[in-house]
A protein has these predicted regions:
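Negatively charged, low-complexity tracts enriched in Asp/Glu with abundant Ser/Thr
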Residues: 1-21
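Short intrinsically disordered terminal tails
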Residues: 1-2, 74-79
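Positively charged, low-complexity intrinsically disordered regions
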Residues: 13-14, 24-27, 78
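Short aromatic-glycine-(Arg/Gly/Cys) micro-motifs in beta-strand/loop hairpins
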Residues: 26-55, 71
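A short, charged, amphipathic alpha-helix used as a generic interaction element across diverse proteins
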Residues: 53, 57-75
């Protein structure tokens, strides 16, 4: 699992409620302004955390947005 500091712009976010054995947080789509190769990341950010978890890295905003909505759909089905 890769951990990154969250000091970039959050473009989209969707809350994820706490459940048995899980914490509340949000699924995020992040733009890393200092990265040229894969500037867009989707991941999960726990409430109060300063780092995201389970990041998927993308070179285009379109692909990152698709992954963001797929993560949101997966989380909705889990609830």
């Amino acid at each position: 699992m890769q951990i990154q500091k969250l000091n970039y712009a959050i473009l989209k976010q969707e809350p994820t409620p706490a459940a048995i054995g899980t914490r509340a947080g949000r699924i995020v789509l992040v733009e890393k302004h200092d990265e040229d190769y894969h500037p867009f990341v989707t991941g999960w950010l726990g409430d109060g955390d300063t780092q995201w978890w389970g990041g998927n890295y993308f070179s285009t905003l379109d692909n990152a947005t698709i992954d963001f909505y797929e993560r949101c759909l997966h989380d909705a089905r889990r609830a």
